[in-house]
């Protein structure tokens, strides 16, 4: 079996790594227990998490043992990484609900049967810490001067970094130490924005336990223009089908830029390398065939083969002018809601997050109702717009929603 390190390297996952030669040898010789942390700050995982779970799946298939660490404790503080403002504080109840939602989604990627993987929650050890003992045992190993040079803190210094958030690095380092003590975990992985936090944990274990510990970060999922992947005019792309329908999920990947096809096939599917190279090198319009394969494969991983096939058929029916709308995201509307402007309707039924987004879409000629382009943001949506009790909204070229009257 190929060394999983070489697989991750070839597919373009690895961004930074500590002790590179040791890690490659370790992953080729021994079964390693590793972890990735996920702070439950929302009630669903999103595309950014998807890449990390693909890494976990590759690692598990190679015989290594994953720990999915839910940040029930660290979410009470909020990670300042990549944020220009302090995160909204969540209640314990919200965090617990979100953690429960995450657990269901992890099982699609990771096999937890027969102790092949572990799901842990750092609330188990963080919530009852003795503060003085924590400072004496952990705080003594952290240099404030060094912490302030970390990119995650630099970005916040101008606007103000709270002491609450400043503790996040210590707590993430302590997580690694605790997982090392409890489960023999020696390897932490995460997005490249977590490099400083990961290094902190590696150094803590090496200083305090005098044991080997390692860290690796992955490429962040960005588009060819450098912007983060996974955002649309309707908001984030979620892995929960109640928040982002399988059809919308499929369409997102079907519509990626030509320049991003190869990266997405490498990072977000299990297709063999020769097939990835063949698809990503298709010339001109033929690259659309690669996008269809990408959309199908990614949707299959997240939502299963049946949902992927239904989304594919719905997209093809709409593209060819067919009339089968059964698999298009459908919203039921109370008749009493009619008579409002199209802008208000789009926001009320959660197709778009704000009226300004709706007006911008109309201004850019990106909205149609039943095939007719909408040019007036004050257009009143009435029963006359419904054909056989249905109204079809299209955003952009290929994002559809069906509205039916209850």
UniProtKB/Swiss-Prot annotation:
A motif ('KMSKS' region) lies at residues 228-232. Pfam families: SYY_C-terminal, tRNA-synt_1b. The keyword ATP-binding applies. L-tyrosine binds at residues 35, 168, 172. Its EC number is 6.1.1.1. Catalyzes the attachment of tyrosine to tRNA(Tyr) in a two-step reaction: tyrosine is first activated by ATP to form Tyr-AMP and then transferred to the acceptor end of tRNA(Tyr). Homodimer. This is Tyrosine--tRNA ligase. It comes from Clostridium kluyveri (strain ATCC 8527 / DSM 555 / NBRC 12016 / NCIMB 10680 / K1). The gene is tyrS.
